[in-house]
Amino acid sequence: MGPLSAPPCTQHITWKGLLLTASLLNFWNLPTTAQVIIEAKPPKVSEGKDVLLLVHNLPQNLTGYIWYKGQMTDLYHYITSYVVHGQIIYGPAYSGRETVYSNASLLIQNVTQEDAGSYTLHIIKRGDGTGGVTGYFTVTLYSETPKPSISSSNLNPREVMEAVRLICDPETPDASYLWLLNGQNLPMTHRLQLSKTNRTLYLFGVTKYIAGPYECEIRNPVSASRSDPVTLNLLPKLPMPYITINNLNPREKKDVLAFTCEPKSRNYTYIWWLNGQSLPVSPRVKRPIENRILILPSVTRNETGPYQCEIRDRYGGIRSNPVTLNVLYGPDLPRIYPSFTYYRSGENLDLSCFADSNPPAEYSWTINGKFQLSGQKLFIPQITTNHSGLYACSVRNSATGKEISKSMIVKVSETASPQVTYAGPNTWFQEILLL
């Protein structure tokens, strides 16, 4: 590759232009009508290729010129020089791949990462007492883009129901990413969204129109590579299952329950869930007809749910909305508070009765078998010995038809009165409280 065979100029950088376009230091003492121009051909180069730093508008009466690697013009960074009449001198920075031409252009062959960076050209003019003109030029090196591949979070998404994340691999510095669908640029749709770097493509609610094929392309200024196409295997949408049940208000340990998972299909398998856990195998649980029906011969208050059923195919499944039972139970044996039975005349009697029950139980009180009142509390102020007797709290659940009572004996004693006795002369009277 030589300066005479270079293509037409596509990038010109003058000593003045270097400061603006590449932020490079420069100075010159040539007339403005004869500014030297350096042109990189090609303007962007990839590793393993050749690049020519082509110099234009050289001044007359040159003695020679020197190329340096970097911006320091010392012996260590000296690449090569050209002296008028054809003498070429190589320096310590010469790698064997640089060629200098009589027009000051520098050819670098088979460039590597070490060749990237700035270069300094020092031009020496005959009779120039200032030492010549020095300018700088920067070579940016790009790698060939690798062939990309597409990774997917889910190659078998449910139609409309599931989202998919596509990633263009590998992550490549100084490169841009482009996605194509059916060989065309991505359509404008709310179902497709790109990440900030364009490397990741999100598909929301995949439909047959955006199932693929997808391709991704990695580009940099010197090359572009495209992946193999990827097409999503769009699965049919699973129907939302639901539970039917013969009784939502069963009586504890009495009623038989039958849950059915709908819809019915031989293409699905059925799974039952209780409290978010797969229902364990138990002698109490019957599952006839391919597990679609769940039978509980009896149910307790601890098995209210929630219950869910799931339908599955070989790719995945979907659960129903939860169903919670209203288990009717009780009343259990009531409890009376406080439980002590001895009182004195004049005290207040304040009793409360509690029993576990669903729905809440109905309460009533009797004394010695005679009905007193309805409710959980029994309050009698300033009781007397006439209030001694058998107190009973009865509880009843109209939904279960169960009734049960609890009784206790209350004993009320007389309050003792003070007794006065004479203890003799010059003594105090004493009050003795007889218990």
Swiss-Prot record:
CDD domains, A to Z: IgC2_CEACAM5-like (cd20948), IgI_hCEACAM_2_4_6_like (cd05740), IgV_CEACAM_D1 (cd05774)
SUPFAM superfamilies linked to this entry: Immunoglobulin
Motif mapping: Cell attachment site: 126-128
Biological processes per GO annotation: female pregnancy
Annotated SMART domains: IG (SM00409), IGc2 (SM00408)
Localization annotation: Secreted
Signal peptide: 1-34
Principal location class: secreted
Keywords: Disulfide bond, Glycoprotein, Immunoglobulin domain, Repeat, Secreted, Signal
Domain of life the protein comes from: Eukaryota
Positions of the Ig-like V-type domain: 35-143
Gene Ontology CC: one annotated term: extracellular region
Sugar-bearing residue positions: 61, 103, 110, 198, 267, 302, 386
Disulfide bonds: 168-216, 261-309, 353-393
Signal listed as a keyword: yes
Domain Ig-like C2-type: 148-233, 241-326, 334-405
Family indicated by similarity: Belongs to the immunoglobulin superfamily. CEA family.
Identification of the protein by name: Pregnancy-specific beta-1-glycoprotein 6
Organism of derivation: Homo sapiens
